[in-house]
A protein has these predicted regions:
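A structure-centric signal for secondary-structure junctions around beta-strands
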Residues: 6, 14, 143-146
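Loop/helix-junction capping segments adjacent to catalytic residues or to phosphate/diphosphate-binding pockets
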Residues: 9, 101, 143
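Switch/coupling sub-region of P-loop NTPases
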Residues: 12-129, 135
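NTP-binding/hydrolysis catalytic cores, primarily Walker-type P-loop NTPases
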Residues: 141-211
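Short, low-complexity Ser/Thr-rich regulatory SLiMs
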Residues: 136-140
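Short Gly/charged-rich anion-binding patches and loops
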Residues: 5, 54, 79, 179-181
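Single conserved hydrophobic/aromatic residue that forms the stacking wall/gate
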Residues: 1-6, 10
C-alpha cells in the first residue's frame, strides 16, 4: 500500500525522495532522484549499529524534499515528527494501530519511549506535522481494505482534532463523511482536480434515490 501511494504521488522530477527502512522492500517506480537508506544491526561485538533514528537525522542532512519511513515502531517517532515539521511536506510513514484515533495515542507512546516530554507538546507536534491519517484493516471477509481516512485540523481542548473524511459503514462499504477542511496543498501539488472528481463520485453514489 505504501509503495503504491508513493509511486502515484511522487512524480515531480525536481524532488529528492529518501526512503528509510529495515531493509529495502518498497517498490517505487518512476522516481528519478531516489535515495534508499537501510538500518544495520550491530556486529558480533555489539558495534556499528545504525538505527532508524540515526537514519532520519542522516536523511535530513541530505536535503530531501520528501521522506518515506517504512514503519515507525519506537522513539524515532519524534525524529519523524521533527522532520515533517521542518519543511518536508508530503512525507509518509506507517505504524500499527486499530484506528486513526488510536494511531495518535500510539505515536504519543512511541515518542515517550525515548524522551520525557509533556504530552501537550507531543500533541502539538502531531497537529502541525501530520495532515491526514489513513487506516487499513481487515474486513469481515478477511481481506485488507481501506477502513478510515481522517484529517488533522489542529488542536482542540488540548487534544489533536480529527476530522473524519471517509469511514467503512456496516455494509462493509467506504462512505464519505465530509470534505477536506484544508485543500491548499492539493492545489499546490496538482491534485485538486483529481480530488474534485473523487468528491463528485462519492456524492453521486451516496445520494438517496427517491422511489
Amino acid at each position: 500500500a505504501l509503495s503504491s501511494a508513493a509511486s502515484d504521488v511522487y512524480k515531480r522530477q525536481d524532488e529528492r525522495i529518501i526512503t528509510i527502512e529495515d531493509s529495502a522492500e518498497l517498490k517505487l517506480n518512476g522516481i528519478d532522484n531516489l535515495v534508499r537508506l537501510e538500518m544495520r544491526n550491530a556486529n558480533a561485538a555489539g558495534e556499528n549499529q545504525v538505527d532508524m533514528k540515526e537514519l532520519i537525522k542522516a536523511a535530513l542532512r541530505s536535503r530531501p524534499d520528501r521522506i518515506i519511513v517504512g514503519e515507525v515502531r519506537g522513539e524515532e517517532a519524534l525524529s519523524m515528527l521533527n522532520a515533517m515539521n521542518t519543511g518536508h511536506d508530503g512525507s509518509i510513514s506507517t505504524g500499527h494501530a486499530n484506528s486513526c484515533k488510536d494511531m495518535l495515542k500510539r505515536i504519543e507512546t512511541m515518542v515517550l519511549m525515548g524522551v520525557d516530554m509533556p504530552v501537550e507538546a507531543i500533541r502539538g507536534q502531531m497537529a502541525s506535522a501530520i495532515d491526514v491519517i489513513i487506516h487499513l484493516g481487515r474486513s469481515f471477509d478477511g481481506s485488507r481494505k481501506l477502513m478510515e481516512i481522517s484529517e488533522i485540523t489542529g488542536m482542540a481542548a488540548s487534544q489533536v482534532a480529527l476530522h473524519p473524511l471517509f469511514e467503512m459503514n456496516e455494509d462493509d462499504e467506504l462512505t464519505m463523511r465530509s470534505e477536506l477542511c484544508d485543500q491548499k496543498k492539493l492545489k499546490e501539488y496538482g491534485q485538486y482536480e483529481a480530488y474534485q472528481k473523487l468528491m463528485e463520485f462519492f456524492k453521486a453514489r451516496d445520494q438517496p434515490v427517491e422511489i
